[in-house]
């Protein structure tokens, strides 16, 4: 039995890492930590959204990618390695998981559409 990441998971993880390496070097992170350059933080957030991480756990029938939690973990590793000051676990992991398992179909349609 194989206990590593799949090729797709590694590909997704590498894309997030490459983006963050290019767009969020330590000097940029320091500027954000100092409370300056909110626009840089917003641009970083938009960049990871463009990579699709906001949709990884949303089911395909609701417009998401329908991936599993191991994809979320792989992405989390990349974000943590960069010390990226970005929202991730709450809005893109916990919220979709709670909605997926606790909402009825009408609620899923409504909430996932807004994500």
Region roles according to the model:
Residues 24-115:
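Glycine-rich flavin
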Residues 14:
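Conserved "HGTGT" condensation-loop signature of ketosynthase/thiolase-family condensing enzymes
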Residues 1-8:
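Intrinsic disorder at enzyme termini
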